[in-house]
A protein has these predicted regions:
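Outer-membrane beta-barrel "beta-signal"
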Residues: 205-217
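Transmembrane beta-strand segments that form the barrel wall of outer-membrane beta-barrel proteins
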Residues: 25-37, 41, 188-199, 203
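Sec-dependent N-terminal signal peptides
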Residues: 5-14
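Flexible, surface-exposed loop regions and adjacent strand-edge segments
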Residues: 81-87, 135-143, 203-208
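Outer-membrane beta-barrel transmembrane domain signature
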Residues: 55-57, 61, 74-76, 94-185, ...
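Glycine- and aromatic-enriched membrane insertion/assembly motifs of diderm outer-membrane
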Residues: 24-26, 34-91, 97-99
Length: 217
């Protein structure tokens, strides 16, 4: 029994350098545009860390990709004058900050000596941290009024007592792009939310288009 335990630990320790060769971490940052029914997109941002594990090798073939991102989702809603003819326009601006965790599986294949193509897809989960909602009204005389509707929209409720903004989000995403010199990654992405992110809009599932860069160590 002792020999089996010793043999197990020897095999485990000897495999660590191989596993380390197939694993690496990096940093990433990017921009995104949040689109959904009844809202107008605004630009958001993301920053965080990521890791990769090559099932056989990080040079090519199948790999796993996971990131931990601080990400903002922003949009606006234009209400016009609501038919009251009291002002020229009225808008609501909302910015949310999430901690997002996408876990993808992808494939890497060489295009040239220094360039590789990357494609990956998988689920994500998000936790809403904080967010504000503000308004802007332009009156008929040209004067403008600005103010805050919700200081933290994740804790706010509507007139029926419903949460206005869901704190948790989940869905699936797709990424594709290139890697240069095994260090620099340039990616385009799309994420689709499977749950409603707001009670104010009927079909409020997230559609997030993104562009990002990463540096792998």
């Amino acid at each position: 029994m002792k020999k089996k335990i010793v043999t197990f630990f020897i095999l485990l320790v000897s495999s660590l350098p191989i596993a380390a060769q197939n694993f690496r971490v990096g940093v990433t940052a990017g921009t995104n545009v949040h689109s959904s029914t009844n809202i107008d997109a605004r630009m958001g941002f993301s920053i965080g860390a990521k890791s990769e594990y090559g099932f056989n090798s990080l040079d090519e073939g199948w790999y796993a990709d996971a990131s931990l991102l601080l990400e903002s989702h922003a949009w606006k809603v234009d209400f016009g004058d609501l038919g009251l003819h009291l002002y020229k326009s009225s808008r609501q601006y909302t910015t949310l900050w999430y901690l997002n965790l996408p876990i993808h599986v992808g494939y890497r294949f060489p295009v040239s000596q220094d360039v590789k193509m990357l494609v990956n897809a998988g689920p994500f989960v998000g936790l809403g941290l904080f967010g504000t909602s503000k308004y802007e009204i332009v009156f008929m005389d040209g004067n403008t009024e600005k103010g805050t509707i919700y200081d933290n929209i994740f804790t706010a409720k509507d007139a029926l007592g419903r949460k206005i903004q869901n704190r948790f989000s989940w869905g699936a995403g797709l990424r594709f792009g290139i890697e240069v010199k095994d260090k620099y990654q340039f990616m385009l992405g799309y994420d689709r939310g499977f749950n409603k992110f707001s009670s104010l809009f009927g079909n409020s599932r997230m559609n997030l288009f993104s562009a990002s860069v990463a540096y792998m160590f």
